[in-house]
Amino acid sequence: MRLILLGAPGAGKGTQAKFICEKFGIPQISTGDMLRAAVKAGTPLGVEAKKVMDAGGLVSDDIIIGLVKDRLKEDDCKNGYLFDGFPRTIPQAEAMKEAGVAIDYVLEIDVPFDAIIERMSGRRVHVASGRTYHVKYNPPKTEGVDDETGEALIQRDDDKEETVKKRLDVYSQQTRPLVDYYSEWAAKGDASAKVAPPQYRKILGVGNVDEITARVFEALK
């Protein structure tokens, strides 16, 4: 089972990725984790990436693809892998295809933007304990304070409505086009590709976690 999980920020990809990896016994491949590991280990690609990052630049797709290919050679990937947060752009998807990285499924978790905004902007956190609440779905007993300590809850900057909207705008411009890219490749194929086209699946990411997980597993049958 080799797959890419697509969906907007706040669509619940992280939660479902965990369930998928547990069910199929595959690792979750995060480019951020790979970069940190390569830099720490001092591999040739890690050294190259560190130079770029130290200079405040963005690590090139060539370096990222090199890291991906190295990571997929490791033993834990022999039964498959799940890409988390990669590819983010069409050039990265093209580079993966060109490098012969095989994908069985591309799974999109589709959640309307207004539902994501409500889901994320309603979160409240007790900083000291990490306990989380939601003003609508999981409210504290007393508005604005932690159930156990009575201390104030905060809304993280990342969860503020204007921040969420900005992240969704970036997703719409950069990552949303991947939905069309992969669905078209799945439907029409690509004779020049080094790997077979993936199957494209889209599920609704609205409802409780168990309902969404059931849809995910049904889509991956």
Swiss-Prot record:
It catalyses: AMP + ATP = 2 ADP. It holds the Pfam family ADK. AMP binds at T31, R36, G57, L58, V59, G85, F86, P87, R88, Q92, R156, R167. Pathway: Purine metabolism; AMP biosynthesis via salvage pathway; AMP from ADP: step 1/1. PANTHER family: NUCLEOTIDE KINASE. Monomer. Consists of three domains, a large central CORE domain and two small peripheral domains, NMPbind and LID, which undergo movements during catalysis. The LID domain closes over the site of phosphoryl transfer upon ATP binding. Assembling and dissambling the active center during each catalytic cycle provides an effective means to prevent ATP hydrolysis. This is Adenylate kinase. It comes from Cupriavidus necator (strain ATCC 17699 / DSM 428 / KCTC 22496 / NCIMB 10442 / H16 / Stanier 337).
